[in-house]
Amino acid sequence: MASGVGAACEELPPDGTCDECEPDEAPGAEEVCRDCGFCYCRRHADAHRQKFLSHRLAAYVHGAQAWTPPASGDDALPEDVEAKGEAEGEVESEVGEEESESEVDSESEEESETEEDSEDESDEESEEDSEEEMEDEQESEAEEDNQEGESEAEGETEAESEFDPEIEMEAERVAKRKCPDHGLDLSTYCQEDRQLICVLCPVIGAHRGHQLSTLDEAFEELRSKDSGGLKAAMIELVERLKFKSSDPKVTRDQMKVFIQQEFKKVQKVIADEEQKALHLVDIQEAMATAHVTEILADIQSHMDRLMTQMAQAKEQLDTSNESAEPKAEGDEEGPSGASEEEDT
């Protein structure tokens, strides 16, 4: 295997193997460098060409003079010059491609980094926006819940006051106990109009000159009336229907008209009985109200008497205290005056 350049190469001619490979494993040479005189296999020839761009490589011919060192750069063969130019162009193109690829890679990396940074920033901004939106939503939900709770409480209060049947019934009972014209308690009964009135209605109201009665009298009169009118009307209705239905001359239409007329009579009797029962209830309620009013009036008068007695007792106590004070002062002066006289 040859080594060295110039004259050294003349003393040690090439042995036909690659000078870069190991001697025991060196394959046959395929190219030879005209500048340094070394022989190379295909792989090391490519590596040598890329490393030394100015060196000229040619095909190695086994059994012949592989190369002769050139006298000067001008004596270089045109083929070698062209091969050198082509090699340099290929190397430059490869280097340019590598540089362009590296530039493209760097640009793509920068763009990807920029995109990642922008994505991170956008993610952070979106997270902040989402947190703010969540806080705003929570605040708005809390306000809505408070407003709903207040509105529900108000609605429940209004509903209780508006739709409570007990309150409505009590209001109706209170309104029924008062005269709609004068606002006084219903304490008298008008026999002509069959209506409860106050004490001012027969004096300055619409019941002047009417026959009146007390609540107790009206209640006893209504209760003592015979309530068998409804029963008698029903028995009479049944008998008349039997008699009418047994008449063969009565048509179906006539029977329908007859039934309607008879039931209207019974309905009138039922309405009278209903009105009577309602009057009894109203009179009882008015009597109870009057009784309670009397009891309250008695209690109030009793309390007034007690208050008067307490005031009188307090005045007497104050008077006795005032009369006792001068006497006590005189008793205190008495012993002191007596002692002074004894000293004199």
Curated annotation (Swiss-Prot):
Ranges in coiled-coil conformation: 290-325
Biological process annotations from GO: innate immune response; negative regulation of protein K48-linked ubiquitination; positive regulation of cytokine-mediated signaling pathway; positive regulation of defense response to virus by host; positive regulation of DNA-templated transcription; positive regulation of non-canonical NF-kappaB signal transduction; protein stabilization; regulation of gene expression
A Pfam family: zf-B_box
Cystine pairs: none
CDD domains found in the cross-reference section: Bbox1_TRIM44 (cd19841), Bbox2_TRIM44 (cd19784)
PTM-bearing positions, type Phosphoserine: S336, S339
Zn finger intervals (B box-type): 174-215
Keywords of this entry: Coiled coil, Metal-binding, Phosphoprotein, Zinc, Zinc-finger
Residue numbers binding Zn(2+): C179, H182, C201, H207
Keyword Lyase: no
GO MF term (any one): ubiquitin protein ligase activity
UniProt feature, compositional bias: Acidic residues: 88-165, 330-344
Location of region: Disordered: 69-165, 309-344
Subunit structure: Interacts (via coiled coil) with TRIM17 (via coiled coil).
UniProt name for this protein: Tripartite motif-containing protein 44
Organism whose genome encodes this protein: Rattus norvegicus
Lineage of the species this protein comes from: Eukaryota, Metazoa, Chordata, Craniata, Vertebrata
Gene name, Swiss-Prot/TrEMBL: Trim44
